Amino acid sequence: MLRSNLCRGSRILARLTTTPRTYTSAATAAAANRGHIIKTYFNRDSTTITFSMEESSKPVSVCFNNVFLRDASHSAKLVTTGELYHNEKLTAPQDIQISEDGKSLVVKWKDGGHHQFPLQFFIDYKGSSFVSPATRKQESRYRPQLWNKRILKDNVKDLLSVSYNEFIDPKDDSKLFQTLVNLQKFGIAFISGTPSSSSEGLTIQKICERIGPIRSTVHGEGTFDVNASQATSVNAHYANKDLPLHTDLPFLENVPGFQILQSLPATEGEDPNTRPMNYFVDAFYATRNVRESDFEAYEALQIVPVNYIYENGDKRYYQSKPLIEHHDINEDNTLLGNYEALIKCINYSPPYQAPFTFGIYDKPSDLNNNLDLNLITTPAKLTERFLFKSFIRGLNLFESHINDFNNQFRLQLPENCCVIFNNRRILHANSLTSSNQQWLKGCYFDSDTFKSKLKFLEEKFPHDK
């Protein structure tokens, strides 16, 4: 994609301040150590590299666009992609030299710029894999593990093994890494032993900022309270009745990726038995069940828009989203066994749902016998009813699954315990009533924050599984 000269400053700054990193698997790196560059030739438009990836493997050749090679370089002669497109001197090589050991080659351009490309670069970009290097940089090496109650309980020992002091220790990131890996795999993690003097939200703020900055929302600029004894219309959590399973803030275009809830100490005289029950469900597991049971209904869940609304005080938010959103399709994630690589996020929140505007019209069954009916619905809107019926069928399958006790992880969150969960994957609910005196403290942070910290720690702990 061509970028304008407006990006020149940021592009140059990035190259001056960023150390290039290689994002490769151990197997791929080992292949590079055993392979070598054999030959190369170039013209004004392209450069062809012939190399082997193993000592005894058959050599392969890849022809690269010269604009790509110059743009991917870290030459001291800094230019924008747009400049490369319009100036052949910046892209056509003047000379190319293969190193004596065959592990790299140096490209020299006509403007005096030069860059040494390691063999690993050409292996990464060889194009024989469905996963591009850019995708590999984004993806974690840990794949989501879809779960029901039994599967999660089998892993609960690891999920509950992180204490607050271990998590918050700035000299040791191992427990932070363990927590983020659990979030990546299961969408949920717990931290025990949080300090009891937390009414101001300082503890949960420290927990969040260990991962990244707190996300401001309609609930406040930092942390927020969840307490049924103080009902208010600001947050649907506060209603004095059990909430259905849902994701938070679906009426925002950029929905917060993760939520943290901390259980605070009991009030004086509180009966521990009245503490609310918390429910968690893996919505990805539920949507996979729909896909396997009724593919036509599953497709409708990807298409039919569900409307969400939030009106309170001076705030007016409105969004329309399908229940299911996918990642871009590739050769890998379309396989039935790799569904966890296909599903991106879930939009499901009955507390904030507005009336449908798609598929709401039907065709009168006796229209032919009532020709005088002045039916004003357009034919295009009438045809939506077929897809909407499939949507309702899929929604029924989805809700039957998430409301099945065997698919729910239920617990009374202990005092001074914290739960972190993926707000785009894990549905949650609680049984707060007017008799419950427990306070929950909450906050949000973004998915980008989580992904950034997880990738950094994966680099720091490359051998952890």
Swiss-Prot record:
Sorted UniProt keywords: Dioxygenase, Iron, Metal-binding, Mitochondrion, Oxidoreductase, Transit peptide
Q: Which GO terms describe its cellular component?
A: mitochondrion
Q: What happens when the gene is disrupted?
A: Increases frequency of mitochondrial genome loss.
- List localization entries: Mitochondrion
- InterPro entries, sorted: AlphaKG_dependent_hydroxylases (IPR050411), TauD-like_sf (IPR042098), TauD/TfdA-like (IPR003819)
- Which terms does the record give in the GO molecular function aspect? dioxygenase activity; metal ion binding
Cofactor(s) of this protein:
Fe(2+); L-ascorbate
Q: What is its EC number?
A: 1.14.11.-
Q: Where does Fe cation bind?
A: 246, 248, 428
One GO BP annotation is: carnitine biosynthetic process
Give the co-factor note: Binds 1 Fe(2+) ion per subunit.
Q: Which domain of life is it from?
A: Eukaryota
Indicate the residues annotated as transit peptide.
1-16
The record makes one more remark, namely: Present with 5800 molecules/cell in log phase SD medium. Accumulates as a carbonylated protein in absence of PIM1, suggesting that the PIM1 protease is responsible for the degradation of its oxidized form in mitochondria.
PANTHER family attached here? GAMMA-BUTYROBETAINE HYDROXYLASE-RELATED (PTHR10696), OXIDOREDUCTASE AIM17-RELATED (PTHR10696:SF25)
Per the record, the similarity remark reads:
Belongs to the gamma-BBH/TMLD family.
Q: What is this protein called?
A: Probable oxidoreductase AIM17
Q: In the UniProt record, what gene is named as encoding this protein? A: AIM17
